[in-house]
């Protein structure tokens, strides 16, 4: 176990230093609270998935970049450590999509299950579990149909479309900006 953690720490450090060099950040880093640094490093060192290890490095780099104005909160660390590689992959694909900013700024836009399954092959059950975890973490929410005309007394009932159509939440977009966008 110690060797595994040591080996991962070396891999992480290589990724971190390479990204820092590419972005010309050496000596310009914004200091972070030790609590944040320790938690990021602890999670990166035990991470088996190379892509997730890269995401941890990206989070640390982005938060240290003085030119990036990001929401540096502990909750993003906690959310990331509760995500699977496939959930991160989906957010990565969305973050690189051509219509990323358009969908982000239009509350009537949404992503659909079929589009996700074209990019990431998985079973319906795997998709459902992935989406329910992203809902649980607050990164996504079901697309809601406004003005459905259905009322319960004086209260409108706004139906949602479950996991078939979804939106990224403000929390999800902040997570993307913190650890996926370079």
Sequence positions of predicted segments:
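Accessory beta->alpha helical hairpin/"wing" motif in late/C-terminal subdomains of nucleic-acid enzymes
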Residues: 38, 48-63, 141-182
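Short amphipathic alpha-helical interface segments
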Residues: 71-120
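Compact DNA/chromatin-associated regulatory and scaffold domains in nuclear/nucleoid proteins
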Residues: 96, 130-134, 172
């Amino acid at each position: 176990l110690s060797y595994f953690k040591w080996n991962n720490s070396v891999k992480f450090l290589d990724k971190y230093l390479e990204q820092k060099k590419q972005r010309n950040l050496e000596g310009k880093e914004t200091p972070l609270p030790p609590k944040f640094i320790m938690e990021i490093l602890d999670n990166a060192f035990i991470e088996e998935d190379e892509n997730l290890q890269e995401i941890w490095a990206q989070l640390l780099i982005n938060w240290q970049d003085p030119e990036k104005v990001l929401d540096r909160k502990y909750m993003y660390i906690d959310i990331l450590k509760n995500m699977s590689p496939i959930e991160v992959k989906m957010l990565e694909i969305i973050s690189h999509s051509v219509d990323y900013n358009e969908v982000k700024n239009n509350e009537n836009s949404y992503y659909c299950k079929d589009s996700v399954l074209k990019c990431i092959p998985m079973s319906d059950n795997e998709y459902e579990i992935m989406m329910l975890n992203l809902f649980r973490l607050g990164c996504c929410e079901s697309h809601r149909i406004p003005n459905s005309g259905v009322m319960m007394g004086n209260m409108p009932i706004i139906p949602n479309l479950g996991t078939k159509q979804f939106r990224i939440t403000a929390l999800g977009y902040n997570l993307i900006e913190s650890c996926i966008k370079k």
